[in-house]
Curated annotation (Swiss-Prot):
This is Trigger factor. It comes from the Bacteria. Residues 481-490 have a biased composition (Basic and acidic residues). GO terms for cellular component: cytoplasm. Residues 436-533 are annotated as: Disordered. It catalyses: [protein]-peptidylproline (omega=180) = [protein]-peptidylproline (omega=0). Its EC number is 5.2.1.8. Keywords: Cell cycle, Cell division, Chaperone, Cytoplasm, Isomerase, Rotamase. One of its GO terms (molecular function) is ribosome binding. One of its GO terms (biological process) is protein unfolding. It comes from Erythrobacter litoralis (strain HTCC2594). The keyword Plastid does not apply. Its main location: cytoplasm.
Length: 533
């Protein structure tokens, strides 16, 4: 193999590799000798088919395989010989006029990782803003839960049902006098004014009393989930078995038991733990941003454009998805377009910090164990259809690049935790509002034109309580796609395992493609589609 360097500018490298026709032909001959003993052909004893016939039968296929393997091996040898550290998958091209019997000229272009010296971590100083959880906060949360879990008691038989009252009803629905599937229910609870049943249903039950029977007529929405009912007029025979009125909920052991807890103390313990988890997430976000800011301030080395492009694309795609869900998508899209350069700066910052964290981790022996990687892979596999999970796990095992991308966020967290342990940390007690304001203030500081804009942190999402805890106030934050809390160390890309024989590229073979993620589940039809929206 002949090697010629054609580009050496900054982090960009390019080479021309020449595989002589003689080399290629010799490898094809070796492949023929290897497979000849297994070839069967009428008129010849097993294993005795002449090499020239084997080559005639399978030569084209062997040639393609030899070219693929030769390109792969040549690129691997180049990277090893030149001691290159590819930032991303090298771009590999085979000359378009190549044909069997001629030299193969392969163009290889790539960006390399910059040389980054791991900084000293001896003088790191961090402030940890802590938020204590008071008994009052715990009870406020429980009271919100109680407000969301309303209780009802039987009303007097003379009471006429009004908005906010709960009805216990039996109903039977029909279209043109014929009952339809799902149009019948017994002891169905319905809170008037809740809007849970199709338009017109609840309104016609206002004023009914316990024991009343009534036939109501409604029209199903044109976009109703059951196509056989969409847009059709239906009649419902309704029997009101009980009118109930809302009553105050007593917060006691019985209330906790209704929520699946042993007693009220256990409920308080659960809520306190969740509130602490929320605030601990915010504390970590603020502390991590302070750490990253310190690291970013002292380092401004060049980063590979390809890595920045890939990071920016990820940020941009998420921002566009979020904008599309806003009340005014066009306005939201214009807003992010106006800040496009800022988001690219965020992407560059992420890549730079990622490379820096990676070097710090390697210099200090931070590693991800095989057990941790296995658990990470199994967790990631859960987002795929059950039949695709095994294939996804095999894909991760076989593709170093995919494994590196999956490993990166966990590795970052381990490096950050390592730095937290090494830093001199002082605690300061603040309110939740002060902590959120501190995070937002850092974001506002980054908006100044003189500074590169970075991503503000996003509040950690609390786990949902079994008791349907009311959501806490959201921390003032910018788009999730650009939060510093998601800084990811750059995954070091592996060279392509195989290069296609024609116009080689970095695309993976089809069998190694990651399985498609399972689609979002379609909303299941309600058990009683006749009466529900």
């Amino acid at each position: 193999m002949q090697t010629k360097e054609t580009t050496n500018e900054g982090l960009k490298r390019a080479y021309k590799l020449t595989l002589t026709a003689k080399e290629i032909d010799a490898k094809i001959d070796a492949e023929v000798k290897k497979v000849a003993p297994q070839v069967r052909m009428p008129g010849f004893r097993p294993g005795k088919v002449p090499a020239n016939l084997v080559r005639k039968m399978h030569g084209e296929q062997m040639h393609a395989q030899v070219i693929n393997d030769s390109i792969r091996d040549s690129v691997d040898a180049l990277i090893k010989e030149k001691e290159l550290r590819p930032a991303m998958q090298p771009k590999i091209d085979l000359n378009e006029d190549y044909e069997q019997g001629k030299d193969a000229v392969v163009s290889v272009s790539l960006e390399i990782l910059p040389k980054v010296e791991a900084p000293s971590i001896d003088d790191l100083k961090l402030e940890r803003l802590t938020v204590p959880v008071s008994d009052e906060q715990v009870m406020e949360t429980i009271e919100r839960i109680a407000g969301q879990n309303k209780s009802y008691k039987d009303a007097a038989k003379t009471r006429k049902a009004a908005d906010g009252d709960q009805l216990i009803i039996d109903f039977t629905g029909s279209v043109d006098g014929v009952e339809f599937e799902g149009g019948k229910a017994e002891d169905a609870p319905l809170v008037l004014g809740s809007g849970t049943f199709i338009p017109g249903f609840e309104e016609q039950l206002k004023g009914v009393k316990t024991g009343d029977e009534k036939t109501i007529t409604v029209t199903f929405p044109k976009d109703y989930q059951a196509e056989n009912l969409a847009g059709k007029e239906a009649q419902f025979d309704v029997k009101v078995k009980q009118v109930k009125v809302e009553t105050d909920t007593t917060i006691d052991d019985e209330f906790a038991a209704n929520l699946g807890l042993e007693n009220l103390d256990k409920l308080k313990e659960l809520i306190r733990g969740q509130l602490e988890q929320e605030t601990n997430g915010l504390t970590r976000t603020a502390m991590k941003r302070s750490l990253l800011d310190q690291l970013a301030a002292g380092h401004d080395f060049p980063v590979p454009e390809g890595m920045v492009d890939a990071e920016f694309e990820q940020i941009w795609n998420q921002l566009q998805q979020e904008a599309a869900q806003e009340e005014d998508p066009d306005k939201a899209l214009k807003e992010i377009e106006a800040e496009k350069d800022d988001y690219r700066a965020i992407a560059e910052r992420r890549v730079r910090l990622g490379l820096l964290l990676s070097e710090i981790g390697q210099a200090n022996g931070v590693e991800i164990s095989q057990q941790e990687m296995s658990m990470l892979t199994m967790q990631a596999a859960q987002q795929y259809r059950e039949e695709d999970r095994e294939r996804f796990m095999q894909f991760i095992q076989q593709d170093p690049m995919a494994a590196a991308q999956l490993r990166a966020p966990l590795y970052e967290d381990k490096v950050v935790d390592f730095l937290f342990d090494k830093a001199e940390v002082t605690d300061r007690e603040v309110t939740r509002e002060e902590l959120e304001a501190a995070i937002e203030a850092e974001a506002e500081e980054e908006k100044k034109p003189a500074a590169k804009k970075k991503a503000p942190a996003k509040k950690a999402e609390p786990k949902k309580a079994a008791a349907k805890k009311a959501p806490a106030k959201k921390a003032p934050a910018k788009k999730a796609a650009a939060k510093d809390g998601d800084e990811k160390p750059a995954a070091k890309k592996a060279p392509a395992k195989k290069a296609p024989a024609k116009k080689a590229s970095t695309k993976k073979p089809a069998e190694k493609k990651a399985p498609a993620k399972k689609p979002a589940a379609k909303k299941a039809p309600a058990k009683k589609p006749a009466a529900k929206k």
